[in-house]
Regions:
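N-terminal binding-site loop/beta-alpha segment at the start of enzyme catalytic domains
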Residues: 1-74, 113, 132, 142
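Active-site beta-loop-alpha junctions enriched in small/polar residues
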Residues: 18-20, 44, 75-79, 120-123, ...
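Alpha-helix initiation/capping motif
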Residues: 66, 77, 93-94
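Eukaryotic helix-linker segments that join adjacent hydrophobic helices
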Residues: 70-85
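Glycine/proline-rich, positively charged
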Residues: 83-166
Length: 166
């Protein structure tokens, strides 16, 4: 584990769980036993199976590897990134509630009380929506649900600075 700017412990390498489908649990266990200490997933059934990551976390106890030894990262995926038939939150709910519902689904799927990192899977337009999303994520962080926040698939340095300053 390595320190970062918020004094959280990050894994040196994360194992990505996208596109593993029914093999997710076995592959996560194999990766962690091989030395990975970070797991990256998302509440996005289109590409991830978070419930099988949760199964893997449970199975790892049989090898003496506890949750607290791992860096667990999940993501909120906005509607545009979801399969319309498998959205893990209420599509018609306000954005803030979608994020809260997605995060609660992640905790249930992962059988975890908290995650080390909650990531916004991609920027959201318009900017006002993006800032609302970030505010909802900050609430999760402030209540201890996520130890740190981030954004992926963002190529706008100005936006990253704005989120950091928020």
């Amino acid at each position: 584990m390595v320190d970062n700017c918020c004094r959280c412990k990050n894994a040196e390498y994360n194992y990505g769980t996208a596109w593993k489908k029914e093999r997710t649990a076995d592959l996560v266990v194999e990766a962690i036993r091989a030395g990975f200490r970070g797991i990256d997933t998302a509440c996005q059934p289109k590409h991830y199976n978070e419930a099988l990551v949760g199964v893997a976390l449970h199975r790892l106890k049989d090898y003496g590897i506890e949750r607290k030894e791992l860096f667990l990262q999940t993501k909120f995926t906005p509607l545009l990134g979801q399969d319309p038939g498998q959205v893990p939150y209420d599509k018609s709910a306000p954005l803030e509630l979608q994020i809260a519902q997605s995060f609660e689904a992640s905790k249930i799927n992962l059988q975890a009380e908290y995650v080390d990192s909650l990531i916004l899977h991609s920027p959201i337009a318009p900017h006002s929506q993006m800032m609302r999303a970030w505010g909802a994520m900050e609430k999760i962080h402030k209540t201890g649900g996520a130890r740190q926040l981030g954004i992926s698939n963002c190529y706008n340095a100005k936006l990253i600075k704005e989120l950091y300053a928020a």
